[in-house]
């Protein structure tokens, strides 16, 4: 029986440890032993990648060119597009992502995700050990673009005449089904080849140089990506890894293979010349995921969402594909839930995952999680838990109930506020849409209601507590503006629904948490190689502005006076020692700058007298009379050692060279670490857990609105869908870089002008590390595809946020939610949805549900479960425990 311990890439880089008996850390051997079960996967994928096919089986470029001339797609000539598949499946937390990390480190491959969330999850995993290149979705890699979102899938159909169908039949069916997207990609790729754009001639140039230098063919092809950074990733490798592949429809498999051959044929890459074929490594769980397809019926103004066969189920269950891919020899199954530390709960999840027989013991275990639905739906119960529902309607109803509860309770910490969102509809485009769809009487109001899920992120538009839509017509601008208010909860947990720009402006946490940030360099690592200097400069700015917090802490009257006096002396000595020889600031200017940099524990700007405590020195002998001259006040404070000498001894600047930036950061870090050590020794946890906050400028929170004078010195970054944020409020502060980004979008001119005039507020979020950011608004264009016409119908402006207080079970997939309360719908129970909902938590102690689904009637994925159980008994399938 094969056993495996998943690869732990977080093993210490410095293996030698003199404190252990043999001088080495024993844990490193455990990490090495894990390779014996992962190694066969690597070896098999390498074998598949090295296979070459005869020249007559290599798809010719002329075949792709013929497709551009077709009038009726079903008449296209059948042609095999050779490929291999390796399948990696398993239940939640079994080690699939760790296996992807090993593949990335051991094989030159293209790592992708089925969705942006999946891609960002993979990137987060890969970045734990080494700096990782950005991970894109599989759609981005094969050439899918924004104008394809509204493409009409299934407009054409192909029906084979033989049973069972051949692999050529299956591929032709998928190409015809996905015709509008694939033919548009084909046109664009051929145009690039004709124009010489995108480095299409790079490989041909290298072939010519090789012949001139009498080098072996292909010996210089490895330099292609150095010479031209715009080469498609598909021309670099023939191993393509897709995480969460179960979310993709079956036609995407053929789309990936089609585009791989198309791009390599156009570029004449070495792998095309040598007859290599693509190896699609599909990672995911076929029993817990569903692929959904949406078709919008324009005549009915209704979106029709239907489940479709996903890639994993397609590969496993289709007999033709099973034989073509030899799936039994190219399948690895991970069957251990390492996230769950409870044996009974872990066994229950495995039973649900693989469709094993459900026993009375399983049902009794689930009985312990059941509470009344009214208990879950009462916002006063289970604070901090995430509610999961079957439908968006239930989510929206709970959010409305929660907001009403918070308004009545008058909770200052979790107060509610509303912000406007806008939709700008082009009148001329809307009139053209009505003509093309034969609906002259269609109103804008009805169109907005019917298309809200397409205009905005679907779950975002359905889950929010939204107000009444108000319409304004601006005929002179050719626009109708629809405005609606969305209610948010202050200090609640949220996620972003798309990648948004953010400007990091500060930090709010504790002295200990900020020391941890500086110690492990996680903040700098997350910036990537191109932004490290900016990260160091930003941290230096924060440290310099936040050093006054150490002196603010010493103002606490509950501290022992002797220890406070000693702290002042040691802080002054440390500062003089570290800053000797640095540029000094003028004394009076130092006081002003220091006061401006000071931030008290509540995040508000500290006044000069409070920041330096000129009149509140412990055991001060100067109590009867206070000098009125500012310089006399400062010298008095110097004598009492209560002034922060950093602002006297050091003039903060913004260095330009890398060495100066890094040197400044090391100096600021040394001051912070030194002060932290002094006060931690004297005051222990009362200091380390005390609030610490620092911003690039003075800030103040007026209810839910953040007021800040200047954002200069902020750090530009991305808000990712995989991160969890705390909603701190909103701000109207101008952010120049966001204004520039709006200008670059090249929206309809009148829409842009109205956006400037409306002055849309920006959200303020805090990430899990404590960094506070201003997040750009989510501005999206909506283009409708009708027949062969593309209409720029609307522009939407919202905040791209979705609450973690409640969501649908479908949207929770891939998220770790810790504390979960589930409301199932008794008449629509599916076992895979039950598994997804229950597996979001790592402990059964934090799981509640309104009913026991194992005692109700439910739908079971019998066919796929039978195939997986058969695979577990198949000696050719590689099983990893």
Curated annotation (Swiss-Prot):
Binding site for ATP: 90-97
GO MF annotation terms: ATP binding; helicase activity; hydrolase activity
GO CC annotation, single: host cell nucleus
Cell compartment(s), UniProt: Host nucleus
Disulfide pairings: none
Transmembrane segments: none
Record key words, sorted: ATP-binding, DNA replication, Helicase, Host nucleus, Hydrolase, Nucleotide-binding
Pfam families named among the record's database cross-references: Herpes_Helicase
GO biological process: DNA replication
Superkingdom, natural source: Viruses
EC id: 3.6.4.-
Keyword Nucleotide-binding: yes
InterPro entries registered for this protein in UniProt: DNA_helicase_dom, HSV_HELI, P-loop_NTPase
Similarity section: Belongs to the herpesviridae helicase family.
Role noted for this protein: Component of the helicase/primase complex. Unwinds the DNA at the replication forks and generates single-stranded DNA for both leading and lagging strand synthesis. The primase synthesizes short RNA primers on the lagging strand that the polymerase elongates using dNTPs. Possesses helicase-like motifs and therefore may act as the helicase subunit of the complex.
Classification via HAMAP family: HSV_HELI (MF_04030)
Subunit structure: Associates with the primase and the primase-associated factor to form the helicase-primase complex.
Protein name: DNA replication helicase
């Amino acid at each position: 029986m094969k056993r495996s311990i998943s690869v732990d890439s977080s093993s210490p880089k410095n293996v030698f440890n003199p404190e252990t008996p043999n001088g080495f850390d024993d844990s490193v051997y455990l990490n090495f032993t894990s390779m014996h079960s992962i190694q066969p996967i690597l070896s098999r994928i390498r074998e598949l990648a090295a296979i070459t096919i005869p020249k007559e089986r290599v798809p010719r470029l002329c075949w792709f060119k013929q497709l551009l001339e077709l009038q009726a797609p079903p008449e296209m000539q059948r042609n095999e597009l050779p490929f291999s598949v390796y399948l990696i499946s398993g239940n939640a937390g079994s080690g699939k992502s760790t296996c992807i990390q090993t593949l990335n480190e051991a094989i030159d491959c293209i790592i992708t995700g089925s969705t942006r969330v999946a891609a960002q999850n993979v990137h987060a995993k890969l970045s734990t050990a080494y700096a990782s290149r950005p991970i894109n979705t599989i759609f981005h890699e094969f050439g899918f673009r924004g104008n394809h979102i509204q493409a009409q899938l299934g407009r054409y159909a192909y029906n084979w005449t033989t049973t069972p169908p051949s692999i050529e039949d299956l591929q032709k069916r998928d190409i015809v089904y996905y015709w509008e997207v694939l033919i548009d990609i084909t046109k664009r790729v051929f145009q690039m080849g004709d124009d010489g754009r995108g480095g299409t001639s790079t490989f041909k140039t290298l072939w010519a140089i090789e012949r001139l230098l009498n080098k072996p063919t292909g010996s210089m092809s490895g330099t292609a990506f150095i010479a031209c950074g715009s080469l498609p990733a598909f021309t670099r490798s023939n191993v393509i890894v897709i995480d969460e592949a179960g979310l993709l429809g079956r036609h995407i498999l053929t789309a990936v293979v089609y585009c791989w051959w198309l791009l390599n044929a156009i570029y004449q890459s070495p792998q095309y010349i040598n007859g290599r074929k693509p190896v699609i490594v599909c990672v995911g769980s076929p029993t817990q995921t569903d692929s959904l397809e949406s078709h919008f019926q324009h005549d009915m103004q209704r979106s029709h969402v239907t489940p479709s066969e996903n890639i994993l189920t397609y590969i496993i269950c289709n007999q033709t594909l099973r034989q073509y891919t030899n799936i039994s020899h190219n399948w690895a199954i991970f069957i251990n839930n390492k996230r769950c530390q409870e044996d009974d709960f872990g066994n229950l999840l495995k039973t649900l995952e693989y469709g094993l027989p459900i026993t009375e013991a399983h049902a009794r275990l689930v009985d312990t999680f059941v509470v009344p639905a009214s208990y879950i739906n009462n916002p006063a119960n289970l604070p901090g838990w995430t509610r999961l529902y079957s439908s968006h309607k239930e989510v929206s109803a709970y959010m409305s109930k929660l907001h009403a509860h918070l308004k009545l309770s008058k909770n200052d910490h979790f107060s509610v506020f509303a912000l406007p969102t806008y939709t700008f509809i082009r009148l001329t485009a809307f009139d053209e849409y009505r003509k093309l769809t034969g609906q002259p009487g269609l109103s804008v109001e009805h169109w907005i209601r019917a298309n809200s899920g397409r205009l905005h992120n679907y779950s975002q538009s359905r889950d929010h507590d939204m107000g009444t839509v108000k319409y304004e017509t601006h005929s002179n601008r050719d626009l109708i503006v629809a405005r609606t208010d969305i209610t948010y909860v202050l200090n609640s947990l949220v996620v972003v629904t798309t990648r948004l720009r953010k400007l990091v402006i500060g930090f709010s946490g504790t002295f200990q948490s900020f020391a941890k940030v500086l110690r492990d360099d996680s903040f700098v690592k997350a910036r990537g190689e191109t932004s490290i200097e900016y990260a160091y400069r930003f941290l230096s700015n924060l440290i310099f502005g936040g050093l006054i917090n150490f002196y603010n802490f010493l103002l606490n009257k509950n501290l022992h006076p002797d220890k406070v006096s000693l702290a002042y002396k040691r802080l002054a000595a440390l500062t003089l020692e570290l800053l000797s020889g640095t540029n000094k600031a003028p004394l009076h200017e130092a006081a002003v700058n220091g006061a401006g940099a000071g931030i008290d524990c509540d995040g508000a700007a500290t006044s000069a007298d409070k920041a330096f405590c000129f009149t509140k020195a412990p055991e001060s002998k100067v109590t009867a009379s206070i000098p009125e001259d500012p310089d006399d006040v400062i010298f008095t404070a110097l004598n009492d050692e209560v002034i922060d000498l950093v602002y006297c001894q050091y003039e903060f600047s913004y260095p330009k060279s890398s060495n100066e930036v890094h040197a400044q950061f090391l100096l600021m870090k040394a001051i912070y670490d030194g002060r932290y050590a002094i006060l931690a020794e004297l005051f222990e946890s009362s200091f380390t857990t005390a609030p610490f906050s620092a911003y690039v400028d003075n800030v103040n929170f007026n209810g839910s609105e953040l007021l800040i004078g200047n954002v200069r010195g902020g750090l530009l970054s991305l808000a990712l869908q995989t991160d969890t944020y705390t909603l701190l409020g909103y701000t109207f502060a101008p952010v120049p870089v966001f204004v520039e980004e709006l200008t670059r979008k090249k929206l309809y001119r009148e829409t842009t002008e109205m956006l400037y005039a409306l002055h849309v507020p920006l959200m303020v979020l805090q990430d899990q590390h404590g960094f506070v950011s201003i997040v750009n608004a989510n501005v999206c264009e909506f283009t409708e595809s009708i027949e062969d016409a593309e209409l720029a119908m609307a522009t939407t402006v919202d905040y791209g946020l979705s609450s973690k207080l409640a969501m649908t079970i479908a949207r929770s997939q891939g998220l770790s939610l810790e504390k979960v309360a589930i409301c199932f719908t008794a008449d629509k129970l599916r076992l895979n949805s039950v598994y997804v909902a229950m597996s979001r938590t790592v402990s059964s102690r934090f799981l509640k549900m309104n009913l026991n689904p194992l005692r109700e009637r439910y739908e079971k994925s019998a066919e796929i479960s039978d195939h997986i159980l058969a695979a577990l008994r198949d000696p050719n399938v590689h099983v990893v425990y």
